[in-house]
């Protein structure tokens, strides 16, 4: 095919992906917002409007986001969604926009929990927007440090470490606005060694379908070849680190020749 044909296919594919992503994202946001409004009716108490409630909503969203994000790294079926964001081997503002379509579904968790806690739905939506906007600017190598605020906030430095593929940078710094959650729950690690971005095993492709589904396909393959039910559940539910190490442990056994019985 000519270069023009290839460019045309890439453009068409990107357009289709953009339209589909927008439609799914809009649907999930609408669902989350609607569920928050309805769940708020069942809250045992309602917070008053005002600055204190507004700030509480932001802090509560950030706290729930921390656990949501942490689980996305520690459970492989959630990692299969989130891995899209981490598959970039570059780190800049565009990386912040590299988001999986299916991750929008997880927004129902903070929306629903905050609504049940009595946070006004409009405050919940504002908390989400502030959280999302804050995450955008920390995807940069241009800002090395912001001084004493590094102790409190999630910063470009902390988030660069989060995107690292070296062992010391795996499964750390899950906070969005505040880094204090990581310090409280033992998942904080400062940026020391220069970060190598991407996955521990990069996929080396720009194919959108492969980027979005490669981990799901790997999970299916691992489950299909797993020797025990314990391994099958592990490949789906345990962390990706365990899954990759277990796959490597099983690979030599799968390659060993079957011994023939000795005639006698």
Labelled PLM ranges:
Residues 7-36, 50-63, 109, 113, ...:
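Hydrophobic alpha-helical topogenic segments used for membrane insertion/localization
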Residues 23-26, 34, 47, 51, ...:
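A broad "ordered helical/assembly scaffold" signature
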Residues 33-45:
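Membrane-interface helix termini and inter-helical loops of multi-pass transporters
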Residues 47-201:
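Membrane-embedded catalytic scaffold of the fatty acid hydroxylase/desaturase
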Residues 194-264:
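Cytosolic-facing loops and C-terminal tails of multi-pass membrane proteins
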